[in-house]
Amino acid sequence: DGNKQPMVDKRGRLFVLEEIDPEFVKSHVNTELYSEYAGRFVKNAYDPQLTEEDATLDIDLSVMLKKENKAFKVEKHEHNYPHCWRTDKPVLYYPLDSWFIKTTAVRERMIELNKTINWKPASTGEGRFGKWLENLVDWNLSRSRYWGTPLPIWISEDGTEKKCIGSVAELVEEIEKSIQAGFMQENPYQGFIAGDYSKENYDKIDLHRPYVDDIILVSDSGQKMYREKDLIDVWFDSGAMPYAQLHYPFEHREDIDQKLRFPADFIAEGVDQTRGWFFTLHAIATMAFDSVAFKNIISNG
C-alpha cells in the first residue's frame, strides 16, 4: 500500500518492536515471526559480541524458510562480497528515497533520434547503445553525498510544497521573501549582482554545501522550506556540457537556440560511455531540445 518504514538501523541491526511505530507494526508486521529475529545484526561483523563461529542471521532465515517449505533449495556458495575500505566490514545496502528524471517518457523519441547519428562502428549505436535505450529505466538523479552540485529543490516542513530554483537571481529573490517572513536574518548573497557573470561577482557567493543548506525559504502557504540534502548525479553535469560551457540559458542563447554551436559535429570516447557520457548527452538533448547532442561519433575500446 506504499506505507514503508526502515526495519534495520544504521548500525545494521534489526529494530526491536518497541522501536517501531506501533501502528505500522499492527498493520504490517508479523510480530510472532519478527520477534524471533528482532535486535539481531544483519551481519555478524557489526555486532562486537559475535564472532565468525556464531550463527548468522542469513543462515538462520534460510533454515527457517526451508523448514516451512518456503525455500526450494538452500546451499552455500563462495563468492565475492563488497567490504568497506575503511572498516573492512561487509557493505549493507539500504533502499533510499531518490529523485528521478522520467526518461522512460521519451524512450521512443530517444531511439528515433539515435538512428540519425552516424556511429562508428555502427554496431555500437545499433547494438550496445540501441539496446540500452530499448531497456531504458528512469534516471536516478540524486546522490546522497557531500561534495558536488546541490539539488536546487526546497521542500516545506510538511512535505506538500516544493520549489525548484532555476538561477542564482531567483534564489536571491526567494531569500528576500524568507527574510520578510522572518525565517532568515540576512541574505548571505547580499552584494551579488544578477546579470553580472564576472568571476569577481561569483566569487562573492558559494552555492555548495554546507552553506546552501543554511538557506531557509518560505512556501506559498507560509511554511519554512529546507533544501533537499542530496546532490545531482555528476553525469548530469557531463551531459549538460554543450550548454553549461556557454552558460546557457543566461548567455549565448543564440548559439544553442539557433544551433550555431550545437549539436556537436563529432565526439569520441570509449565504449564504456554507453551508459555514461553518450547516454546523458543524448538524454538531456532529447528532453530539452528534441535534438541529438552529436552528429558523428567514434566509440573505441
Regions found by a protein language model. Name each.
Residues 1-194, 207, 277-278:
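Residue patterns forming the tRNA-binding/recognition surfaces of aminoacyl-tRNA synthetases
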Residues 57, 115-120, 131-132, 136-138, ...:
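Conserved active-site neighborhood of enzyme catalytic/cofactor-binding cores
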